[in-house]
Amino acid sequence: MRLQDLSPGLGELDERHRLRRRATLESPQGDEVVIDGRSYISFASNDYLGLADHPSLVRALQQGADRWGAGSGASHLLTGHTLAHQQAEEALAGFVGREAALLFGSGYAANLAVITSLVGRGDAVFADKLNHASLNDGCLLSRADFQRFRHNDLAHLEQLLADSGAPTKLIAVDAVYSMDGDQAPLPALLALAERYDAWLYVDDAHGFGVLGDGRGSAALHGLASDRLIYMATLGKAAGLAGAFVAGCRPLVDWLVNKARTYIYTTAQPPALAAAVGASLRLIAEGGERRERLRQLISRCRQRLEGTPYAGASATAIQPFVVGSDENAVRLAETLREQGYWVPAVRPPTVPENGARLRISLSARHELSQLDALLDLMLRPAES
């Protein structure tokens, strides 16, 4: 893309209803937010347990800054790895029942790290068609043979695995799919990984803190295997920022030595790491929050049942697929006029003709807020 092509390119995106603009939040995250000077009820964040503004987390972060300062100042392999980082990794590993864990600045960085460190030229990686962009980018950057199987189609995956002669194989999936909210069949995927001597890499960005009593999708299914690599983010249900990878000790040691997005970057602020313990305690004690979330999910599914918008999601992500980009943008604008913030999601984030509004539920929402939103969203279909 040349300099002279930028403005016309942006104009083309605008004409196709695909120009992205940032909204400026002027309040803490929550069910009610202030954006560009106006108050809205938000169904747009991934703050599933409502912890992003929890007093205990805010206090832990402040205390961490008082103890460790504002920045880490170096990469983990120089002088950026503090006791706060070490204790956070130990706590995270114990929480999800693995030998070791490694902190990353983001889930994107973690996904690139794991995939590019374990497979390369001559190897093969097998990815679900609906995987997050960061998983796809990791697969592409690895230079391994990148094969995509139909969404949650175990027979198709097994065929690809059986036909592959690659010495190292890696299966990469989202545990909860970010745009549809449905879940990967993890037990069956692990069985295939065992059968074909493959790694199973699970991105549980949207399951950690919510599923399996908060310990995530692998815990929900009682899965334990050294070939299962578990990644979760700390910026969604956990209320903080960053991510971690958990697995057997040799795996984590390998990543410390080979993962470029771990080695060649400054460590995340130690104050964030210092707050991880408080986050895990809130998650462990968050049974009532998860029950409230289940009630909201049930209500949403009940309201959408029998409409063209009913889906397969039993998680906090409830997609409302409208098809065209223009219709999605128009509906989002209508909701904003009524005081609801539910942004339109358009290609390439979702497939062509799959534009949607993604209803993201939080334990902080009231049933009345959800009902009022759905009344507005379903009105065109009911009229």
UniProtKB/Swiss-Prot annotation:
It holds the Pfam family Aminotran_1_2. GO terms for molecular function: 8-amino-7-oxononanoate synthase activity; pyridoxal phosphate binding. It catalyses: 6-carboxyhexanoyl-[ACP] + L-alanine + H(+) = (8S)-8-amino-7-oxononanoate + holo-[ACP] + CO2. Substrate binds at residues 20, 132, 349. Pathway: Cofactor biosynthesis; biotin biosynthesis. Catalyzes the decarboxylative condensation of pimeloyl-[acyl-carrier protein] and L-alanine to produce 8-amino-7-oxononanoate (AON), [acyl-carrier protein], and carbon dioxide. This is 8-amino-7-oxononanoate synthase. It comes from Chromobacterium violaceum (strain ATCC 12472 / DSM 30191 / JCM 1249 / CCUG 213 / NBRC 12614 / NCIMB 9131 / NCTC 9757 / MK).
